[in-house]
């Protein structure tokens, strides 16, 4: 209790000139005794301290969690193998069944900041990488900047990309934008990739394509995995769930090489969750250096497109993408 009071007092002193107070408080969450709640009074995030780094909850205060939670994995720690658990995490890409899936089942260091916190994991024995997530919540409103970082503590230069994965709750629809479209015969050269995996089935009814958008519906009754990737200099995705929308946005650099045949965005689903993922460029990272993937998040109410058409998604979602920020 004393530690919670000190944390809140320290953060409050720094943020006295802000429009609204950013609070960081230690709390119990679904069996974990060492979680941290970051809030500005309107939205809140819960970060695990016993495992991770993970953002296990994001939602309006008192509202639904937009993120997936695996109930049977909550409140636990110390497992030998990687646990999905739910929420938002940082990985290395391309995906490797051993190094990418390194366990994150031990306590993390929590460092309060003026606008949130940093959750920093210890160095992974398997990879000699150290992962951290920093949350910077707006003092008012419903936007957050989330920085996903990986530091190379090995003796060698390693090449990989930072990969920010957000697991969404069941029953929603993901929407992502394609890059600006052109016209034939003016634009004759290929412009951007649409990447398949070996298990991708474009005949699956959960997919829907329009000229400007890719949508994927999460179906709790369909256990078949689906995944696609794409590149967009203005990478963004939205997840629509029960009248609310989660938006994440980042910038991608077309002059750099991205993993998985050039993907800055990927989306995956099965019967348990849907994932929206952004990727940074492949980087040759020297010992002691850090790479990061910065995302801008927004949360919005009363978002209910009447149909998944270009015109309706333009009307409903594009203003929210702009409001989320990250266009610079």
Describe every region a protein language model picked out.
Residues 41, 110, 283-301:
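Short Pro-Gly-centered flexible turn/kink motifs
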Residues 143-151:
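Short beta-strand elements of extracellular/lumenal beta-sandwich folds
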Residues 43-45, 51-57, 65, 153-161, ...:
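A contiguous, surface-exposed recognition patch within enzymatic or periplasmic domains that forms
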Residues 21-26, 92-143, 155-160, 172-173, ...:
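Extended, loop-rich substrate-binding clefts of extracytoplasmic carbohydrate-active enzymes
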Residues 299-328:
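Terminal connector regions
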Residues 19-35:
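Short, Gly/Pro- and small/polar-rich lid/capping loops
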Residues 5-16:
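Bacterial N-terminal signal peptides
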Residues 35-103, 256:
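Acidic-aromatic substrate-binding/catalytic surfaces of carbohydrate-active enzymes
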